[in-house]
Protein backbone atom coordinates (compact mmCIF):
# COMPACT_ATOMS: atom_id res chain seq x y z
CA UNK A 1 0.00 0.00 0.00
CA UNK A 2 1.34 3.42 -0.95
CA UNK A 3 1.88 6.12 1.64
CA UNK A 4 -0.59 8.94 0.83
CA UNK A 5 1.52 11.52 2.68
CA UNK A 6 4.59 10.66 0.60
CA UNK A 7 2.56 10.73 -2.63
CA UNK A 8 1.08 14.12 -1.71
CA UNK A 9 4.49 15.62 -0.95
CA UNK A 10 5.95 14.15 -4.15
CA UNK A 11 3.14 15.62 -6.24
CA UNK A 12 3.53 19.06 -4.65
CA UNK A 13 7.29 19.03 -5.29
CA UNK A 14 6.79 17.95 -8.91
CA UNK A 15 4.12 20.59 -9.52
CA UNK A 16 6.42 23.26 -8.08
CA UNK A 17 9.22 22.08 -10.41
CA UNK A 18 6.76 22.09 -13.34
CA UNK A 19 5.89 25.76 -12.81
CA UNK A 20 9.50 26.74 -12.07
CA UNK A 21 10.70 25.26 -15.36
CA UNK A 22 7.74 26.71 -17.25
CA UNK A 23 8.59 30.23 -16.13
CA UNK A 24 12.13 29.84 -17.49
CA UNK A 25 10.83 28.39 -20.76
CA UNK A 26 8.44 31.32 -21.17
CA UNK A 27 11.35 33.72 -20.77
CA UNK A 28 13.46 31.83 -23.31
CA UNK A 29 10.67 31.77 -25.90
CA UNK A 30 9.70 35.46 -25.65
CA UNK A 31 11.13 36.21 -29.07
CA UNK A 32 9.61 33.15 -30.76
CA UNK A 33 6.47 33.06 -32.86
CA UNK A 34 3.06 32.38 -31.35
CA UNK A 35 2.87 28.97 -33.03
CA UNK A 36 6.14 27.80 -31.50
CA UNK A 37 5.18 29.07 -28.05
CA UNK A 38 1.81 27.28 -28.25
CA UNK A 39 3.38 24.01 -29.42
CA UNK A 40 6.00 24.05 -26.65
CA UNK A 41 3.37 24.90 -24.05
CA UNK A 42 1.08 22.03 -25.18
CA UNK A 43 3.92 19.50 -25.32
CA UNK A 44 5.33 20.55 -21.97
CA UNK A 45 2.08 20.44 -20.02
CA UNK A 46 0.96 17.22 -21.74
CA UNK A 47 4.10 15.47 -20.50
CA UNK A 48 3.70 17.01 -17.04
CA UNK A 49 0.09 15.81 -16.79
CA UNK A 50 1.03 12.30 -18.00
CA UNK A 51 3.73 12.12 -15.34
CA UNK A 52 1.51 13.37 -12.52
CA UNK A 53 -1.36 11.16 -13.65
CA UNK A 54 0.90 8.11 -13.77
CA UNK A 55 1.95 8.66 -10.16
CA UNK A 56 -1.68 8.87 -9.04
CA UNK A 57 -3.09 6.05 -11.18
CA UNK A 58 -0.18 3.62 -11.52
CA UNK A 59 -1.65 1.00 -9.12
CA UNK A 60 -4.76 0.80 -11.32
CA UNK A 61 -2.89 0.00 -14.53
CA UNK A 62 -3.23 -3.76 -14.97
CA UNK A 63 -1.56 -4.37 -18.32
CA UNK A 64 2.11 -5.09 -17.50
CA UNK A 65 3.42 -3.76 -20.81
CA UNK A 66 1.44 -0.52 -20.53
CA UNK A 67 2.81 -0.17 -17.00
CA UNK A 68 6.35 -0.59 -18.37
CA UNK A 69 5.98 2.19 -20.90
CA UNK A 70 4.04 4.65 -18.76
CA UNK A 71 6.53 4.14 -15.93
CA UNK A 72 9.48 4.66 -18.27
CA UNK A 73 8.06 7.77 -19.92
CA UNK A 74 7.14 9.25 -16.54
CA UNK A 75 10.52 8.48 -14.97
CA UNK A 76 12.30 9.76 -18.06
CA UNK A 77 10.34 13.00 -17.93
CA UNK A 78 11.00 13.44 -14.20
CA UNK A 79 14.74 12.93 -14.73
CA UNK A 80 14.60 15.36 -17.65
CA UNK A 81 12.92 17.96 -15.46
CA UNK A 82 15.45 17.47 -12.68
CA UNK A 83 18.30 18.09 -15.13
CA UNK A 84 16.63 21.27 -16.40
CA UNK A 85 15.75 22.46 -12.92
CA UNK A 86 19.30 21.85 -11.67
CA UNK A 87 20.87 23.90 -14.47
CA UNK A 88 18.27 26.66 -14.06
CA UNK A 89 18.87 26.68 -10.31
CA UNK A 90 22.63 26.99 -10.78
CA UNK A 91 22.01 29.99 -13.01
CA UNK A 92 19.59 31.54 -10.51
CA UNK A 93 22.13 31.10 -7.72
CA UNK A 94 24.74 32.76 -9.93
CA UNK A 95 22.41 35.65 -10.71
CA UNK A 96 21.40 36.01 -7.08
CA UNK A 97 25.04 36.06 -6.01
CA UNK A 98 25.90 38.75 -8.55
CA UNK A 99 22.88 40.77 -7.47
CA UNK A 100 23.95 40.54 -3.83
CA UNK A 101 27.52 41.51 -4.69
CA UNK A 102 26.20 44.45 -6.67
CA UNK A 103 24.08 45.62 -3.76
CA UNK A 104 26.93 45.28 -1.29
CA UNK A 105 29.33 47.16 -3.55
CA UNK A 106 26.68 49.79 -4.38
CA UNK A 107 27.00 48.88 -8.03
CA UNK A 108 24.19 48.11 -10.40
CA UNK A 109 23.39 44.41 -10.13
CA UNK A 110 22.52 44.35 -13.81
CA UNK A 111 26.12 44.89 -14.87
CA UNK A 112 27.04 41.55 -13.33
CA UNK A 113 24.39 39.62 -15.20
CA UNK A 114 25.64 39.95 -18.77
CA UNK A 115 28.84 39.07 -20.54
CA UNK A 116 30.55 41.90 -22.38
CA UNK A 117 30.02 40.24 -25.75
CA UNK A 118 27.49 37.83 -27.23
CA UNK A 119 24.68 35.98 -25.51
CA UNK A 120 24.04 36.78 -21.84
CA UNK A 121 25.38 33.83 -19.92
CA UNK A 122 22.09 33.27 -18.10
CA UNK A 123 20.44 32.63 -21.47
CA UNK A 124 23.29 30.32 -22.43
CA UNK A 125 22.92 28.27 -19.24
CA UNK A 126 19.16 28.09 -19.64
CA UNK A 127 19.42 26.81 -23.19
CA UNK A 128 22.14 24.41 -22.06
CA UNK A 129 19.74 22.96 -19.50
CA UNK A 130 17.00 22.62 -22.10
CA UNK A 131 19.41 21.03 -24.56
CA UNK A 132 20.84 18.49 -22.11
CA UNK A 133 17.43 17.55 -20.75
CA UNK A 134 15.82 17.28 -24.19
CA UNK A 135 18.68 15.12 -25.48
CA UNK A 136 18.27 12.81 -22.51
CA UNK A 137 14.50 12.47 -22.96
CA UNK A 138 14.75 11.93 -26.71
CA UNK A 139 17.45 9.28 -26.21
CA UNK A 140 15.23 7.42 -23.74
CA UNK A 141 12.35 7.41 -26.23
CA UNK A 142 14.73 6.32 -29.00
CA UNK A 143 15.97 3.51 -26.75
CA UNK A 144 12.56 1.83 -26.87
CA UNK A 145 13.51 0.65 -30.36
CA UNK A 146 16.77 -0.94 -29.19
CA UNK A 147 15.46 -3.46 -26.69
CA UNK A 148 15.61 -6.31 -29.23
CA UNK A 149 18.62 -5.00 -31.15
CA UNK A 150 20.76 -8.03 -30.30
CA UNK A 151 24.45 -8.00 -31.08
CA UNK A 152 27.11 -10.69 -31.10
CA UNK A 153 30.20 -9.81 -29.05
CA UNK A 154 33.13 -12.07 -29.92
CA UNK A 155 35.88 -12.84 -27.42
CA UNK A 156 38.91 -15.11 -27.68
CA UNK A 157 39.89 -16.37 -24.24
CA UNK A 158 42.99 -18.30 -23.26
CA UNK A 159 42.84 -20.74 -20.34
CA UNK A 160 46.02 -22.18 -18.86
CA UNK A 161 46.16 -25.97 -19.11
CA UNK A 162 43.29 -26.21 -21.58
CA UNK A 163 43.48 -29.58 -23.37
CA UNK A 164 44.37 -29.20 -27.03
CA UNK A 165 41.07 -30.73 -28.18
CA UNK A 166 39.25 -27.66 -26.81
CA UNK A 167 41.19 -25.16 -28.91
CA UNK A 168 38.57 -23.37 -31.01
CA UNK A 169 35.76 -24.60 -28.73
CA UNK A 170 32.84 -22.13 -29.07
CA UNK A 171 30.76 -21.06 -26.07
CA UNK A 172 27.68 -18.87 -26.20
CA UNK A 173 27.16 -16.88 -23.00
CA UNK A 174 23.80 -15.18 -22.37
CA UNK A 175 22.36 -13.67 -19.23
CA UNK A 176 19.36 -11.81 -17.81
CA UNK A 177 16.57 -12.91 -20.14
CA UNK A 178 13.88 -11.42 -17.86
CA UNK A 179 11.06 -13.17 -19.70
CA UNK A 180 8.41 -11.23 -17.79
CA UNK A 181 9.49 -8.08 -19.62
CA UNK A 182 9.60 -9.55 -23.12
CA UNK A 183 6.70 -8.79 -25.47
CA UNK A 184 7.58 -9.41 -29.11
CA UNK A 185 8.08 -13.09 -29.97
CA UNK A 186 9.23 -12.43 -33.50
CA UNK A 187 11.89 -10.02 -32.29
CA UNK A 188 13.11 -12.40 -29.59
CA UNK A 189 13.16 -15.24 -32.13
CA UNK A 190 15.69 -13.22 -34.13
CA UNK A 191 17.94 -13.25 -31.07
CA UNK A 192 17.53 -17.01 -30.75
CA UNK A 193 18.32 -17.41 -34.45
CA UNK A 194 21.52 -15.43 -33.92
CA UNK A 195 22.52 -17.84 -31.16
CA UNK A 196 21.80 -20.86 -33.33
CA UNK A 197 23.70 -19.37 -36.27
CA UNK A 198 26.94 -19.37 -34.25
CA UNK A 199 26.84 -23.19 -34.00
CA UNK A 200 28.12 -23.15 -30.42
CA UNK A 201 29.63 -26.22 -28.78
CA UNK A 202 28.29 -25.14 -25.39
CA UNK A 203 25.75 -22.58 -24.14
CA UNK A 204 25.99 -20.96 -20.70
CA UNK A 205 23.28 -18.85 -19.04
CA UNK A 206 24.08 -16.80 -15.94
CA UNK A 207 20.72 -16.16 -14.33
CA UNK A 208 17.59 -14.01 -14.15
CA UNK A 209 15.41 -16.08 -16.45
CA UNK A 210 12.35 -14.30 -15.00
CA UNK A 211 11.55 -11.06 -13.20
CA UNK A 212 9.76 -12.70 -10.28
CA UNK A 213 7.56 -15.68 -11.13
CA UNK A 214 8.11 -18.97 -12.91
CA UNK A 215 4.81 -18.49 -14.78
CA UNK A 216 6.43 -15.69 -16.81
CA UNK A 217 8.05 -18.41 -18.93
CA UNK A 218 4.77 -20.05 -19.99
CA UNK A 219 4.57 -18.26 -23.34
CA UNK A 220 8.29 -18.49 -24.04
CA UNK A 221 9.07 -22.19 -23.65
CA UNK A 222 8.83 -22.85 -27.39
CA UNK A 223 11.29 -20.04 -28.09
CA UNK A 224 14.03 -20.66 -25.54
CA UNK A 225 13.86 -24.45 -25.80
CA UNK A 226 15.45 -23.97 -29.23
CA UNK A 227 18.71 -23.02 -27.51
CA UNK A 228 20.77 -26.21 -27.74
CA UNK A 229 24.41 -27.25 -28.13
CA UNK A 230 26.30 -30.55 -28.58
CA UNK A 231 27.91 -30.25 -25.13
CA UNK A 232 24.74 -28.98 -23.49
CA UNK A 233 23.15 -25.85 -22.09
CA UNK A 234 24.05 -25.05 -18.48
CA UNK A 235 22.45 -22.38 -16.34
CA UNK A 236 22.43 -20.83 -12.91
CA UNK A 237 20.11 -18.56 -10.91
CA UNK A 238 20.13 -14.79 -10.51
CA UNK A 239 18.67 -12.60 -7.79
CA UNK A 240 15.32 -12.21 -9.59
CA UNK A 241 14.79 -15.96 -9.92
CA UNK A 242 14.03 -16.50 -6.23
CA UNK A 243 10.84 -14.43 -6.08
CA UNK A 244 12.34 -12.25 -3.36
CA UNK A 245 10.64 -9.12 -4.73
CA UNK A 246 7.10 -10.51 -4.48
CA UNK A 247 4.91 -10.61 -1.39
CA UNK A 248 3.89 -14.27 -1.20
CA UNK A 249 0.96 -15.54 0.84
CA UNK A 250 3.12 -18.22 2.46
CA UNK A 251 6.73 -19.38 2.54
CA UNK A 252 5.55 -22.55 0.86
CA UNK A 253 4.18 -20.57 -2.09
CA UNK A 254 7.52 -18.85 -2.55
CA UNK A 255 9.37 -22.16 -2.40
CA UNK A 256 6.93 -23.70 -4.87
CA UNK A 257 7.66 -20.85 -7.28
CA UNK A 258 11.38 -21.64 -7.06
CA UNK A 259 10.68 -25.34 -7.55
CA UNK A 260 8.57 -24.50 -10.60
CA UNK A 261 11.36 -22.36 -12.02
CA UNK A 262 13.86 -25.16 -11.57
CA UNK A 263 11.47 -27.39 -13.50
CA UNK A 264 11.28 -24.75 -16.24
CA UNK A 265 15.05 -25.04 -16.68
CA UNK A 266 14.71 -28.81 -16.90
CA UNK A 267 11.86 -28.58 -19.42
CA UNK A 268 13.96 -26.26 -21.57
CA UNK A 269 16.67 -28.91 -21.59
CA UNK A 270 18.98 -26.68 -19.57
CA UNK A 271 21.08 -28.20 -16.78
CA UNK A 272 20.69 -25.90 -13.78
CA UNK A 273 23.81 -25.84 -11.61
CA UNK A 274 22.98 -25.29 -7.94
CA UNK A 275 26.30 -24.96 -6.11
CA UNK A 276 27.83 -27.83 -8.04
CA UNK A 277 30.24 -28.63 -10.83
CA UNK A 278 30.30 -30.78 -13.95
CA UNK A 279 32.94 -31.90 -16.42
CA UNK A 280 32.75 -30.70 -20.00
CA UNK A 281 34.28 -33.62 -21.88
CA UNK A 282 35.62 -34.02 -25.38
CA UNK A 283 37.64 -36.92 -26.78
CA UNK A 284 38.64 -38.11 -23.32
CA UNK A 285 39.74 -34.66 -22.09
CA UNK A 286 37.75 -32.24 -19.96
CA UNK A 287 37.59 -28.94 -18.11
CA UNK A 288 35.45 -28.04 -15.11
CA UNK A 289 32.28 -25.96 -15.20
CA UNK A 290 31.06 -24.63 -11.84
CA UNK A 291 27.70 -22.98 -11.21
CA UNK A 292 26.50 -21.38 -8.01
CA UNK A 293 23.33 -19.74 -6.80
CA UNK A 294 23.22 -15.97 -6.53
CA UNK A 295 26.01 -14.47 -4.44
CA UNK A 296 26.48 -10.72 -4.18
CA UNK A 297 28.86 -8.49 -2.28
CA UNK A 298 26.07 -5.89 -2.18
CA UNK A 299 24.01 -6.00 1.01
CA UNK A 300 20.66 -5.59 -0.77
CA UNK A 301 21.17 -8.72 -2.88
CA UNK A 302 21.12 -12.31 -1.58
CA UNK A 303 24.02 -14.64 -0.83
CA UNK A 304 22.55 -18.04 -1.60
CA UNK A 305 25.66 -19.32 -3.37
CA UNK A 306 28.06 -21.76 -1.72
CA UNK A 307 31.23 -21.76 -3.77
CA UNK A 308 33.06 -24.04 -1.35
CA UNK A 309 30.45 -26.75 -1.95
CA UNK A 310 30.44 -26.11 -5.68
CA UNK A 311 34.22 -26.56 -5.93
CA UNK A 312 34.20 -29.93 -4.17
CA UNK A 313 36.11 -32.68 -5.97
CA UNK A 314 37.63 -30.44 -8.64
CA UNK A 315 41.08 -31.00 -10.13
CA UNK A 316 42.64 -27.55 -9.75
CA UNK A 317 45.21 -28.32 -12.44
CA UNK A 318 42.52 -28.21 -15.12
CA UNK A 319 40.74 -25.03 -16.31
CA UNK A 320 37.74 -23.96 -14.26
CA UNK A 321 34.93 -21.77 -15.59
CA UNK A 322 32.57 -20.36 -12.96
CA UNK A 323 28.99 -19.22 -13.59
CA UNK A 324 28.00 -16.62 -10.99
CA UNK A 325 25.28 -14.08 -11.71
CA UNK A 326 26.60 -11.06 -9.82
CA UNK A 327 30.02 -9.68 -10.89
CA UNK A 328 30.71 -8.28 -7.41
CA UNK A 329 31.32 -11.89 -6.38
CA UNK A 330 34.59 -11.90 -8.34
CA UNK A 331 36.60 -9.44 -6.22
CA UNK A 332 34.79 -10.24 -2.97
CA UNK A 333 35.32 -14.01 -2.87
CA UNK A 334 36.64 -15.57 -6.07
CA UNK A 335 39.94 -13.67 -6.36
CA UNK A 336 41.00 -13.85 -2.69
CA UNK A 337 39.89 -17.44 -2.03
CA UNK A 338 39.79 -19.32 -5.34
CA UNK A 339 42.78 -18.40 -7.51
CA UNK A 340 42.28 -21.63 -9.47
CA UNK A 341 39.11 -20.19 -11.08
CA UNK A 342 40.54 -18.87 -14.34
CA UNK A 343 37.32 -17.51 -15.83
CA UNK A 344 34.10 -16.29 -14.25
CA UNK A 345 31.02 -15.43 -16.33
CA UNK A 346 28.41 -13.01 -14.96
CA UNK A 347 25.57 -10.69 -15.91
CA UNK A 348 23.22 -8.80 -13.58
CA UNK A 349 24.14 -5.18 -14.35
CA UNK A 350 22.59 -4.91 -17.87
CA UNK A 351 25.09 -2.06 -18.28
CA UNK A 352 22.12 -0.21 -16.73
CA UNK A 353 20.66 -0.35 -20.28
CA UNK A 354 22.02 3.18 -20.58
CA UNK A 355 25.45 4.51 -21.40
CA UNK A 356 28.03 5.26 -24.04
CA UNK A 357 30.20 2.63 -25.65
CA UNK A 358 32.65 2.40 -28.52
CA UNK A 359 35.89 0.46 -29.10
CA UNK A 360 37.88 3.04 -27.12
CA UNK A 361 35.52 4.18 -24.41
CA UNK A 362 32.63 2.94 -22.31
CA UNK A 363 30.62 4.69 -19.63
CA UNK A 364 27.42 4.04 -17.73
CA UNK A 365 26.05 5.33 -14.41
CA UNK A 366 26.10 1.71 -13.21
CA UNK A 367 29.89 1.95 -12.89
CA UNK A 368 29.34 4.08 -9.79
CA UNK A 369 27.83 0.97 -8.18
CA UNK A 370 29.67 -1.89 -9.91
CA UNK A 371 33.39 -1.74 -10.61
CA UNK A 372 33.00 -4.55 -13.15
CA UNK A 373 29.85 -3.86 -15.14
CA UNK A 374 30.31 -4.85 -18.81
CA UNK A 375 32.86 -6.75 -20.84
CA UNK A 376 36.21 -8.28 -19.90
CA UNK A 377 38.21 -7.70 -16.72
CA UNK A 378 41.32 -9.51 -15.60
CA UNK A 379 44.07 -9.84 -13.06
CA UNK A 380 47.37 -11.56 -13.74
CA UNK A 381 45.81 -15.04 -13.58
CA UNK A 382 42.03 -14.63 -13.45
CA UNK A 383 39.42 -13.28 -15.85
CA UNK A 384 35.85 -12.05 -15.54
CA UNK A 385 33.39 -11.46 -18.35
CA UNK A 386 30.20 -9.49 -17.63
CA UNK A 387 27.44 -9.97 -20.21
CA UNK A 388 25.28 -6.89 -20.85
CA UNK A 389 22.08 -8.94 -20.78
CA UNK A 390 19.73 -10.47 -23.34
CA UNK A 391 16.55 -8.91 -21.94
CA UNK A 392 15.59 -5.79 -20.05
CA UNK A 393 14.01 -4.80 -16.76
CA UNK A 394 12.04 -1.69 -15.78
CA UNK A 395 12.89 0.60 -18.67
CA UNK A 396 11.77 -1.24 -21.86
CA UNK A 397 14.66 -0.07 -23.95
CA UNK A 398 18.40 0.38 -24.26
CA UNK A 399 20.44 3.50 -24.91
CA UNK A 400 24.03 2.90 -25.95
CA UNK A 401 24.30 -0.48 -24.20
CA UNK A 402 22.69 -3.03 -26.51
CA UNK A 403 21.41 -6.51 -25.64
CA UNK A 404 24.24 -8.99 -25.91
CA UNK A 405 24.98 -12.51 -27.04
CA UNK A 406 28.59 -13.32 -26.21
CA UNK A 407 30.51 -15.73 -28.42
CA UNK A 408 33.60 -17.02 -26.61
CA UNK A 409 36.24 -19.00 -28.46
CA UNK A 410 38.74 -20.88 -26.31
CA UNK A 411 42.27 -20.50 -27.60
Residue locations for each model-derived region?
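Arginine residue identity/basic-tract feature
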Residues: 2, 37, 41, 67, ...
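Short, charge-rich amphipathic segments
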Residues: 17-30, 116-131, 154-163, 189-203, ...
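Acidic, His/Gly-rich catalytic cores of divalent-metal-dependent hydrolytic chemistry
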Residues: 18-23, 31, 52-66, 149, ...
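C-terminal segment of N-terminal export signals and the immediately downstream linker at the start
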Residues: 101-104, 135-172, 182-186, 190-193
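A short, flexible N-terminal coil/short beta segment enriched in small residues
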Residues: 119, 125-128, 136-155, 256-275
Amino acid sequence: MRNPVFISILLMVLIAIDFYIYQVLKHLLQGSGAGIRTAVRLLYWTLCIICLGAILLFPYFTNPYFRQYIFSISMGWMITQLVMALVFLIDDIRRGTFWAVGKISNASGAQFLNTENGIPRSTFLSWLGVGLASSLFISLIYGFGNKYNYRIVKKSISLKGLPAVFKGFKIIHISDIHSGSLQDKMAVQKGIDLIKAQNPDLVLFTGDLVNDRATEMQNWMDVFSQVKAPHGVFSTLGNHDYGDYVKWDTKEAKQQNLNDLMQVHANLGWRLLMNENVKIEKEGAHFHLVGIENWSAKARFPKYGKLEDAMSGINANLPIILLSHDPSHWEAEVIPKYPEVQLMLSGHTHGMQFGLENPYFKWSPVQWVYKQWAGMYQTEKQQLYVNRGFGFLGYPGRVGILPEITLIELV
